[in-house]
Amino acid sequence: MAGSRRRIRLALLFGGRSTEHAISCISASGVLRALDRDVYDVVPVGIDTHGRWVVLPDDPTALAVTGDRLPAVVAAHGESVVLAADPTTPGLLPCRPRGGLDSVRNTLGSSDALGSSDIPGDIDVVFPLLHGPFGEDGTVQGLLEMAGLPYVGSGVFASAAAMDKQHMKALLRAAGLPVGSYAVLRAGDTLTGADQERLGLPVFVKPARGGSSIGISRVEAWADLDTAIKAARASDPKVLVESAIVGREIECGVLGILDGPGAEASVPAEITVTSSAGFYDFEAKYMSDATHFDVPANLSHAVREEVRGAAIAAFEALDCAGLARVDMFVTADDHVIINEVNTMPGFTPTSMFPRMWEASGVTYPQLVDRLVRLALRDGAGLR
């Protein structure tokens, strides 16, 4: 229509090579439903577990959980593409099965078809809805900066620092923020007797660069430590052993302010786990009803504001951008201890980040739109 505004072409990246592949797909299903097609020309780009990029149909139902089946990106269901790291060329290029590049068209076709002649090359903004290594850890963020594409979320440094729990905790502690006691085990390392005495029991053993509680074990006896370390190393050769903190599990969302600098915090939420695992593991998060959520959390005004302030302080200490979810503990004497910072929190229907913002007056579609607008405002280049 003459005079109509061109839609914003948004590439939604999901899937990926990490163990959180399925969670990313479920998150993408929710975001696809939330995006206004009158505003956005959406290009769903799935990354399979081998790292192949494919343009897929714009179908949220294909990425939803069906019974006990988790979704996955299947390369055969779409058209293979690569992202050009040269900012002078279109963002997405058709790719032959053996890796050769087709010629790039001068005139781009519709994104509704999946033929190689219709792959939309030019991209205005990217939403890298990827969780875990090879997606949330600064790798894809660096690629997007090389390609000259604006993208949702934190930059290379913040993404990498938040993904690696060792460095995240070190940076938070250096900023004067409270974190729990921990030890780092690299390949071949074992926990020393001095560390055992310092940490005490129980402890949590987890991959240093994992998420969605995959590979995490609660250890009640030192005799079980080696088994837990082996389980964590299935995801990451570097492992963290953390002192268990007795307290309420509290989460708080942080979101960039669109019409000015800085960020704001959502109302906090509380997680109570009733499963036999006794902690917020993968099954409790995504596959069962063994978790109770209070949104907002029942906290005193003073503690609530301390939690919100700590969330923003952690966000700023890591130099985050766009969004983050900060996980904390509140002890019986109302001390706030920061556990983790997630720079690309889940967007599944049960995820806490959108639920906390919904309780704060920001609807799911408004949340997604604001994140994209923040990315467009900040533009391409270094964060």
Curated annotation (Swiss-Prot):
Residues 169-373 form the ATP-grasp domain. It catalyses: 2 D-alanine + ATP = D-alanyl-D-alanine + ADP + phosphate + H(+). Keywords: ATP-binding, Cell shape, Cell wall biogenesis/degradation, Cytoplasm, Ligase, Magnesium, Manganese, Metal-binding, Nucleotide-binding, Peptidoglycan synthesis. InterPro entries: ATP-grasp, ATP_grasp_subdomain_1, D-Ala_lig_Van_CS, D_ala_D_ala, Dala_Dala_lig_C, Dala_Dala_lig_N, PreATP-grasp_dom_sf. Binds 2 magnesium or manganese ions per subunit. It comes from the Bacteria. One of its GO terms (biological process) is regulation of cell shape. One of its GO terms (cellular component) is cytosol. Its cofactor is Mg(2+); Mn(2+). It is found in: Cytoplasm. Mg(2+) 1 binds at residues 327, 340. The keyword ATP-binding applies. Its EC number is 6.3.2.4. One of its GO terms (molecular function) is metal ion binding. ATP binds at residues 196-251. Mg(2+) 2 binds at residues 340, 342. PANTHER family: D-ALANINE--D-ALANINE LIGASE, D-ALANINE--D-ALANINE LIGASE A. Cell wall formation. Belongs to the D-alanine--D-alanine ligase family. NCBIfam families: D_ala_D_alaTIGR, PRK01372.1, PRK01966.1-4. This is D-alanine--D-alanine ligase. It comes from Frankia casuarinae (strain DSM 45818 / CECT 9043 / HFP020203 / CcI3).
